Regions:
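Extracellular glycan-modifying ectodomains
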Residues: 1-391
């Protein structure tokens, strides 16, 4: 445009506003018969075009606000405890708690069958490796936490208790670590605009996990809670709900004597600053996008394999954590209790657990940390497969 500066709403910046960044779109990668038949080409093409629509985010936010106004007017008559952020949204607003929630999932026969299948896979994995101990922790979320008001919006909601009853079935060869919390505990320990827990909820989960692993008398004790007043945190629920009124602040714990850990991320040497970006936050070196994923920005994004070496540890034991992003803020806590801690994310590393354990024979404990959508995902199923099925 001959060097003329355009307003932000004429550029791709506005299209990126609600996603925390431009949607990765590569139609050429799906320009094949398989891409056409699967629909991947159409999705990629739509994303590529959508990135360039002027005023896209402004229009989305304005439209959602109009719909929300009508819903709130109706709520004056019906008195719902929570209601959709806009018509057809999977995100609900709960004004009394000043938070957003993901509407509960139905307990379909397919979902329950998948849970049973994953449980059987975990059991079979444990049987193939009697020399290791196996633990499973499924983190609650706003879809399944007990007492969530969104469960009243659908019939036959899937609850944490129902999933737990499948995994903790007696006779299994892995130990189920119960992650169930009350709704009050959930409201205190999870972000109000995002699907991730905050550091308080994560630390309570760490205490349960470490106790189950045998470290009840060696638990970390935080020195103080650090709260960052800026930047404001509008997470995945705020983006998907097209809602700007609800915000979180990033919080973290400081410890008086936390050991120095050596870090390797996907084969490259790194530092603790790569796992917790507190220096960036102290220097206000943060993303300008209002809907930036602050959880990933402050802690870290998802990687295939992270290795944490604790040279100060007296332990000769190694830990393998098989996890999704729920572990990103708290894997460092568990690493304090082991010589080496590996964090493997099946979504970004297609190695089976069998293959990993064959190459890392000093691993004594294996701990799964995931919320239900990823625990029941195909990537986890593949990670649990016997290695000889891949040959």
């Amino acid at each position: 445009m001959g060097g003329v500066a355009l307003p932000s709403w004429f550029t791709a910046d506005d299209a990126a506003y609600l996603s925390g960044g431009v949607v990765e779109a590569d139609p050429a990668a799906y320009a094949s018969l398989e891409g056409f038949s699967s629909g991947e080409f159409q999705i990629a093409a739509e994303d590529a075009v959508g990135n360039c629509i002027p005023m896209k985010a402004t229009a989305l936010l304005a439209n959602a606000a109009l719909q929300r106004s009508a819903i709130e007017t109706s709520n004056a008559l019906f008195g719902w405890e929570c209601y959709p952020a806009f018509y057809g949204s999977s995100i609900a607003e709960m004004p009394s708690r000043h938070r957003l929630l993901e509407i509960a999932e139905k307990a379909t026969s397919d979902t329950l069958a998948t849970a049973s299948h994953i449980r059987d896979g975990l059991d079979a994995l444990s049987l193939r490796h009697p020399e290791q101990r196996f633990f499973v922790y499924m983190g609650p979320d706003s879809m399944n936490v007990e007492g969530s008001p969104t469960a009243k919006l659908i019939s036959n909601p899937l609850t944490y208790g129902e999933l737990s009853s499948i995994f903790e079935d007696e006779g299994g060869h892995f130990q189920w670590i119960d992650g169930n919390v009350t709704f009050d505990e959930f409201a205190d320990g999870w972000n109000s605009t995002d699907h991730h827990w905050n550091i308080q909820g994560a630390f309570r989960a760490y205490e349960r996990m470490a106790s189950a692993l045998g470290f009840r008398d060696e638990l970390l004790v935080p020195a103080r809670l650090v709260t960052y007043d800026a930047p404001s945190f509008r997470g995945t629920f705020a983006r998907r709900g097209l809602e700007t009124r609800y915000v979180d602040q990033m919080i973290d714990y400081e410890f008086a004597d936390f050991p120095q850990l050596s870090i390797i991320i996907d084969g490259a040497e790194a530092s603790m600053d790569s796992l917790v970006h507190w220096k960036n936050y102290q220097a206000a070196n943060v993303g300008a996008n209002a809907f930036t994923s602050r959880y990933a920005e402050y802690f870290h994004t998802d990687y295939g394999l992270i290795t944490l070496e604790n040279e100060e540890s007296d332990s000769r034991q190694d830990l393998l954590i098989v996890a999704d992003s729920y572990s990103n803020c708290m894997e460092r806590f568990l690493a304090v209790h082991y010589r080496t801690t590996y964090v493997l994310d099946p979504r970004h590393d297609d190695e089976t657990i069998d293959a990993f354990l064959a190459q890392h024979q000093d691993v004594s404990d294996v701990l799964f940390i995931m919320r239900s959508p990823n625990m029941l995902a195909q990537a986890t199923e593949h990670a649990l497969e016997p290695e000889d099925m891949r040959e």
